[in-house]
């Protein structure tokens, strides 16, 4: 159903509609005319309120559950409220400082992403989601440092100063050969991504143009493979706080919650949904059936892209929960968290 403009509602209808939505988002329960009649700002009789509620229901903004005499917003109604009536509650100074400090203490980027997902879950009372950055950094050099007992520490340095290391098996390879292999790889990976460097070196070896002997060529393969395999196994999505979805109201609708938890297990599909927010200028809000993945579970997703220091979008983060999320609070919180995480991305 198309969302009617807010301006088409009378002042009375707009006021009652807003009170119903805000009451529902706060309590998770339908709001009745008796409750509304106690609002001093309305100064209307229960009969007048019931008449307006019926009108709002007839145009698809409210619905009356069979188990209650009250009304709750439909997905169409929630969209109208979010787009035209919601007053966002910006994070307080204390909340902003807490977010920044928690991210600073998180350590390497992988830990920062996990901390971000957990933090979004804690702040929203829903499940937090963070897509792992899809970017491939340019590399500067690799060093193979002998450790003894047939092992070496492979140290990979990026142009942005990031350092990663892995232990690889080297057999009885002498130290001077490790240095030769390090120089060979460094000369060919500088300024390239790992994928670009790997393709170039493997082609050079396959074409017989490499000056390395067979043992050294095998060592090159092992040195590259340890990162290639590791990258392939990295998760595309980090989800935390699924337990938040099992609140008291969830017990009344276990089928919906079970469907939502099943959907969250399909992380590739969730990541594809978040990808649709990658090019968004601002935080995106998907309400209920507006996204196909979570349509059956009646859930909402709030997502925002996060950028590196150069302003390039490298991932998306957000929260997912029931459609009665506190949008006014969660939307600016997701936006601020995305900007804070971006400051940590090189």
Swiss-Prot record:
Top-level taxon of origin: Bacteria
Gene Ontology biological process terms, A to Z: negative regulation of DNA-templated transcription
Coiled coil feature spans: none
Database matches in Pfam families: HrcA
Keyword list, A-Z: Repressor, Stress response, Transcription, Transcription regulation
GO molecular function: DNA binding
Family named by the database record: Belongs to the HrcA family.
Role noted for this protein: Negative regulator of class I heat shock genes (grpE-dnaK-dnaJ and groELS operons). Prevents heat-shock induction of these operons.
Name of the featured protein: Heat-inducible transcription repressor HrcA
Gene: hrcA
């Amino acid at each position: 159903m198309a969302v009617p403009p807010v301006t088409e509602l009378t002042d009375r209808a707009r006021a009652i509609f807003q009170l119903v939505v805000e009451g529902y988002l706060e309590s998770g329960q339908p709001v009745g005319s008796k409750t509304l009649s106690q609002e001093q700002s309305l100064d209307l009789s229960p009969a007048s309120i019931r008449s307006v509620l019926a009108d709002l229901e007839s145009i698809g903004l409210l619905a009356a559950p069979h188990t209650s005499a009250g009304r709750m917003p439909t997905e169409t109604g929630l969209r109208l409220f979010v787009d035209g009536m919601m007053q966002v509650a910006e994070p307080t100074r204390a909340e902003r400082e807490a977010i920044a400090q928690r991210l600073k203490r998180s350590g390497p980027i992988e830990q920062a992403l996990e901390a971000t997902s957990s933090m979004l879950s804690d702040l929203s009372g829903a499940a937090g989601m963070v897509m792992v950055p899809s970017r491939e950094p340019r590399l500067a050099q690799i060093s193979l440092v002998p450790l003894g007992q047939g092992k070496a520490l492979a140290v990979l340095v990026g142009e942005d100063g990031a350092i990663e290391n892995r232990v690889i098996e080297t057999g009885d390879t002498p130290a001077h050969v490790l240095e030769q292999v390090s120089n060979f790889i460094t000369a060919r990976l500088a300024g390239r991504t790992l994928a670009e460097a790997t393709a170039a070196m493997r082609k050079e070896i396959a074409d017989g143009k490499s000056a390395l002997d067979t043992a050294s060529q095998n060592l090159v393969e092992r040195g590259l493979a340890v990162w290639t395999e590791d990258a392939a196994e990295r998760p595309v999505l980090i989800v935390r706080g699924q337990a938040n979805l099992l609140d008291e109201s969830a017990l009344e609708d276990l089928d919906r919650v079970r469907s939502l938890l099943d959907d969250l297990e399909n992380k590739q599909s969730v990541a594809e949904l978040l990808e649709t927010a990658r090019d968004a200028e601002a935080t995106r809000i998907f309400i209920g059936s507006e996204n196909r993945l979570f349509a059956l579970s009646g859930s909402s997703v709030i997502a925002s892209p996060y950028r590196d220091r150069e302003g390039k979008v490298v991932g998306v983060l957000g929260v997912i929960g029931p459609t009665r999320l506190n949008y006014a609070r969660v939307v600016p919180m997701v936006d601020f968290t995305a900007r804070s995480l971006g400051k940590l991305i090189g």
